[in-house]
Design a protein with these regions (language model features):
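Short alpha-helical scaffolding segments that buttress acidic/His motifs in well-ordered protein cores
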Residues: 22-26, 302-303, 348-356
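Acyltransferase
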Residues: 19-24, 51-54, 243, 266-292, ...
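Short helix-loop capping/hinge segments that flank enzyme active sites or metal/cofactor-binding pockets
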Residues: 66-86, 248-257, 309-370
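Residue-level signal for inorganic ion chemistry
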Residues: 26, 46, 99, 218, ...
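Conserved hydrophobic/aromatic pocket- or pore-lining residues that grip, position, or stack substrates
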Residues: 46, 74, 106, 134, ...
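Short, well-ordered alpha-helical
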Residues: 1-95, 122-124, 234-237, 243-245, ...
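A short helix-breaking turn/cap at a secondary-structure junction
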Residues: 187-272, 334-338
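Short glycine/serine-rich loop segments
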Residues: 99-100, 104-225
């Protein structure tokens, strides 16, 4: 599919459409949607920003490529003054006091935030069913799950409610729902995009990434968000990806992990489609190498061990003291216990308990360090 960003940009510049009409139309679609993809819409902010874009165009001023382009935000990113709930009871009334670096860069480029998007609570899940706002429905077939945890973001892009959305990927949470909803999702190299302002799940693998209907739009958005950030010590400086780097590739060799695709867990159709894609790559004269990695059956257990350990640590701060839906009890210890047990989802509690177990004395050497 062609770049929607470039198409809309040209329509705005040529005055074929107004930014206000564009934004209002998208907001109407979001508010009327039946896919449970929306946690909250940002009507006032979005229309204020749209009016400013229209004023610039009316005055003959040049607008940037992302200026006036409507986008969605997975509800785990801070955007000052908006609800950031992580689709959880604990933070259902929490308002962001600041804005995430990646989101701020998009705002600085003129993009217009429309919506905070439904997702698995705190990113804990792969179906977008683990949320207080109701399970997200698949954009292709509403009888199926949307994937997760960035399910709402993927559905909104697929249904053209947003031009692009910003999701989060720890262990497939952008790429998997993108695939489920027939769009593109990209997990960048760790550190390419600052994590500042993203609610931490597993900090050593959390990544900020875009979802869109074209690779070109992924490229445009990624370039804007990328870069070293003094607020995130793991962030790195990176080279901008040019349009030519994608359209005129100099890649001569591609590798894939043969043991992954041969796993019994892979659906037959997915395996067939993957191998068909490999043949298309070969047909372009690119050498394809079969690689071996460590056993595929220990991948999931390795991921869960690390992710549960880190999320147990990261979510220990959420006890209702400084923020969140505090539930008072007879004493402080019971207040902490009731606040967390009543406000965390079953899946989140499973991951916290599992994380505390693998980090506890006697288990850390046997499980975590192994």
């Amino acid at each position: 599919m062609e770049s929607q960003i470039k198409k809309i940009h040209q329509q705005l510049v040529s005055k074929e459409i107004t930014c206000t009409a564009l934004v209002q139309g998208k907001l109407d679609l979001l508010q009327q949607n039946t896919y449970n993809s929306v946690n909250s819409t940002l009507d006032v902010l979005a229309l204020e920003l749209a009016a400013k874009v229209d004023a610039k165009i009316a005055n003959g001023e040049t607008i940037g490529l992302l200026e006036g382009i409507p986008f969605g935000i997975k509800d785990v990113y801070m955007l000052q003054g908006t609800y950031t709930t992580a689709s959880s009871d604990l933070l259902k009334n929490y308002k962001s006091p600041y804005t995430a670096t990646a989101i701020q860069k998009l705002l600085d480029a003129g993009a217009i935030p429309l919506v905070k998007e439904n997702c698995d609570s705190f990113g804990h899940g792969s179906s977008s069913e683990n949320t207080i706002f109701g399970a997200v429905k698949n954009a292709v077939n509403p009888e199926l799950v949307a994937g997760g945890s960035s399910g709402g973001s993927a559905v909104n892009v697929a249904k053209k409610y947003t031009v692009f959305s910003i999701g989060g990927d720890t262990g497939g949470s952008i790429r998997q729902p993108a695939g489920y909803n027939h769009i593109y999702g990209f997990k960048p190299t760790y550190g390419r995009v600052s994590r500042y302002g993203l609610m931490a799940y597993a900090s050593s693998t959390d990544c900020v990434g875009p979802l869109a209907k074209s690779i070109e739009d992924i490229r445009i958005v990624l370039n804007v968000m990328s870069g070293k950030d003094p607020k995130d010590q793991t962030s790195i400086a990176s080279t901008e990806i040019s349009e030519e780097a994608i359209s005129v590739s100099s890649i001569k060799t591609v590798g894939y992990f043969k043991n992954f695709i041969e796993s019994e867990a892979i659906d037959a159709k997915i395996k067939a489609d993957f191998l068909a894609a490999i043949e298309k790559i070969k047909a372009k004269g690119i050498e394809v190498k079969e690689l071996d990695f460590f056993k595929s059956d220990i991948l999931v257990s390795t991921y869960y061990t690390l992710a549960m350990a880190e999320t147990a640590s990261n979510l220990s701060r959420l006890d209702g003291t400084n923020y969140g839906n505090r539930i008072e009890a007879e004493n402080l210890i019971e207040t902490y216990a009731v606040t967390r047990s009543e406000n965390f989802s079953e899946e989140t509690k499973r991951r916290i308990v599992g994380g505390n177990q693998v980090l506890s004395q006697g288990f850390s050497d046997e499980i975590y360090l192994k």
